[in-house]
From Swiss-Prot:
Sequence intervals crossing the membrane: none
GO biological process: transmembrane transport
Lineage of the species this protein comes from: Bacteria, Pseudomonadati, Pseudomonadota, Gammaproteobacteria, Enterobacterales
Protein name (database record): sn-glycerol-3-phosphate-binding periplasmic protein UgpB
UniProt entry tagged with the keyword Transport: yes
Family listed: Belongs to the bacterial solute-binding protein 1 family.
């Protein structure tokens, strides 16, 4: 009898523990962070899981931003969407117009978590805020601005002051010629050419990218990046390209690897590229602001963000949404947001994270680490330098890439390429406008 009782008790305990294990709510989180950035995402998830044993955040790398967005939407249509989907900033209008999301402010409200939306830096939060309700639709996560990375050792070899980086595009052209003359195979390369050379070039120099305040004021916006200032800028890059001073190495972040491998002396890339540069560069490097056009009065203005936010997908149960809310709240805590900023180079997305980082002396110990924030806050944004909210923007970026490539290969002039990009892009905007009204 005693043996049977012990067996029954053991079985009951076993079932109880099994039940507890099964009670863990698994929360898939699809993202596009690879390399050192992916390791930081995994670290955040592990720390949350340890502190919240009832939930398990499962980060899954699903490819680059475009691939992740496509995979997420496709999965939603088949009923297999993740709970959390990281979407890059130009996918915002697409996500807003979809029926695939549950706004984050509703997620927090339903979970009974008092979440202060005002904690986010306004210029970041504004990108993901619903104009009608004034609430966040997605949560800012890895926001960035383009910055200029430069090889201080290469500068010294070329007889350039390693503490004096080029401030204007005209100066950058002069620097690249000297760097090439000193033996560098590549004087300058750029990542994310559409985002940096047109979207941010326009904002940084106080120019609209599209009408209707870059789409924030309506879906009937038209593209306007084929004006004389933008054409002149692309023409300058093309002249550098012909001389071999500017190297086109790819549409995404390929220039970062070319930089930290020592092939290119300078690159404009995401501030979020700092994590990989810090890990792999074997030389002294510096970080500076994006160049501006010396001939444009009032420049520089302010940078607009890139990177991505976290969207919550529809169709999940209450317990999953509660876990999602707790995880998003965890990410926004000052100590976690500050650590993410410091380890990756992405912007501090909350005011508290910025203040904590400053109080810790991080900016004093790491000169240049605050460049991305300073660019974003350089001047109060104009109505058309707050960012972009244009439908089908991922596809428009692809068009821009194709047309700029036609310039670098000598098939089109800068004016022809930008005119064509605007015409093709406007066709996509009209399709989005029509679909959004149906």
């Amino acid at each position: 009898m005693i043996s049977l009782r012990h067996t029954a008790l053991g079985l009951a305990l076993s079932l109880a523990f099994t039940g507890q294990a099964l009670a863990v709510t698994t929360i898939p989180f699809w993202h596009s962070m690879e390399g050192e950035l992916g390791k930081e995402v995994d670290s955040l998830a592990q720390r949350f899981n340890q502190a919240n044993p009832d939930y398990k955040i499962v980060p899954v790398y699903k490819g680059n931003y475009e691939q992740n967005l496509s995979a997420g939407i496709a999965a939603f249509r088949t009923g297999n969407a993740p709970a959390i989907l990281q979407v890059y900033e130009v996918g915002t209008a697409t996500m807003m117009a979809s029926k695939a999301i549950k706004p984050v402010y509703e997620v927090f409200k339903d979970a009974g978590i008092n979440f202060d939306e005002s904690q986010f830096v306004p210029t970041v939060a504004g990108y993901y805020t619903d104009a009608k309700s004034g609430h966040l639709l997605s949560q800012p996560f890895n926001s960035s601005t383009p910055v200029l990375y430069y090889n201080k050792d290469a500068f010294k070899k070329a007889g350039l002051d390693p503490e004096q980086l080029p401030k204007t595009w005209q100066e950058l052209a002069d620097y690249t010629a000297k760097l090439r003359a000193a033996g560098m195979k590549c004087g300058y390369a750029s990542g994310w050419q559409g985002w940096i050379q047109l979207e941010n070039f326009s904002a940084w120099n106080g120019l609209p990218f599209a009408s209707k305040n870059n789409g924030f004021d309506g879906t009937d916006a038209v593209l306007e990046f084929n004006k004389p200032e933008q054409v002149k800028h692309i023409a300058l890059l093309e002249e550098m390209n012909k001389k071999g001073d500017f190297s086109y190495v790819g549409r995404k972040d390929e220039s970062t690897e070319k930089f930290y491998n020592g092939d290119c002396a300078m690159t404009t890339a995401s501030s979020g590229s700092l994590a990989n540069i810090r890990q792999y560069a074997k030389f002294n490097y510096g970080v500076g602001m994006m160049p501006y056009d010396a001939d444009i009065k009032g420049a520089p203005q302010n940078a607009i963000i890139g990177g991505a936010s976290l969207w919550v997908m529809q169709g999940k149960d209450k317990e999953t949404y509660t876990g999602v809310a707790k995880f998003l709240d965890f990410l926004a805590k000052p100590e976690n947001a500050a650590e993410w900023h410091q380890k990756t180079g992405y912007l501090p997305i909350t005011t508290a994270a910025y203040e904590l980082t400053r109080e810790q002396g991080y900016y004093d110990k790491n000169p240049g680490a605050d460049i991305a924030t300073r660019q974003m806050l350089n001047k109060p944004p104009l109505p058309f330098t707050k960012g972009l909210r244009l439908g089908n923007m991922p596809q428009i970026r692809t068009i821009v890439d194709e047309e700029l490539e036609s310039v670098w290969t000598g098939k089109k002039t800068p004016q022809q390429a930008l005119d064509t990009a605007v015409d093709r892009g406007n066709q996509l905007l009209r399709r989005f406008e029509k679909a959004s009204k149906s």
